[in-house]
Amino acid sequence: MLGLSGCKGGAVADNAEEKASGKGLVIGWSQRGISGSDWWKTLVEGGQAEAGKVGARIELLDANGDTVRQNADVQTLITKGVDVVVMNPNDPLGLGPSVQALKDAGIPVVTVNSSLDKSLVPDMFCYVAEDQEHTGSLAGESLAQKALEKYGDQGQIKIVGIGGFPGDVLSDLRFNGFMTGWNRVMDKHPGVTTVKLDTKYGEWKPDKALAPIRDVATANPDLKVIYSMSDVMHGGIVQGLQQAGLWGDGILMASYDGGMGAIKEMVDDPKGPLQADASNQPWDQGAAAVRMALAAFNGDQSQCADKTNYIDTTVITPAEAPDYYVPTDTYVRAKD
């Protein structure tokens, strides 16, 4: 009996040691939604690829935009005995029951792309995302340089941003970041006066973005710079500017997401209006979430200081677009 007991203990120890390296680790992935979103699909695929590299396995459950269902999904993952949970929260506060259940079960939780309410953060190991304000600033800085090249360092530059919804955090962070980057450049050129128009909103949909951008362009025929806070609205913005007679050589545009369609546009038309696209790299966010899940299993908080892990992001201009364009991908990935 002692021999059998010793053998079992050794096997358990070996298993724990293997999981510490990722081999055999079971990661429960609670996704807010996948259907209809190439971005979320890419996020999950990045996580799955990273798990495969270290020998871990992902148990994926999709809540399809339903917070009640996502809470039930987390309970299912707990019942299945997963080692750690990666969660893409549908509702920052509504997943409180799941966070408490995971805490009671001794299962660490990593959030990715969207975080939890601040009241729940103490029970979260790590939040993985891009720093949206910093990423937006990359686009602003890049487009400001393009504007100086195109319009010179004297005169007025009228600019408008188009976001998702009034007051939504994503729009605020992305636009504030853009203007920080823009002003960082333009502050060195006092001959340029930036006239910032009121932000317009397109509900993150191309058809909803068309009318607002058309109307502001019609009312401001001297509009020179447009910043779209998501590539998904790009088609509607282009149509709106075309209808207002402004799409073409007189306009400069930056966008946000790093969608492959935007990258291809810059490859095909390097002198066109679109001159910068800030990339938030969902594949890399998913991969980082799995790395943080492994760190959480090992209790290594040093891997996620301050409970936040921002991935490195970049901005792509027509000069870099050929290097980042991969027809089989939907979004830009980090370069090795």
Enumerate the language-model features and the residues they cover.
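Sec-dependent bacterial lipoprotein signal peptides
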Residues: 1-5
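A residue-level marker of the well-folded mature domains of exported/periplasmic proteins
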Residues: 6-336
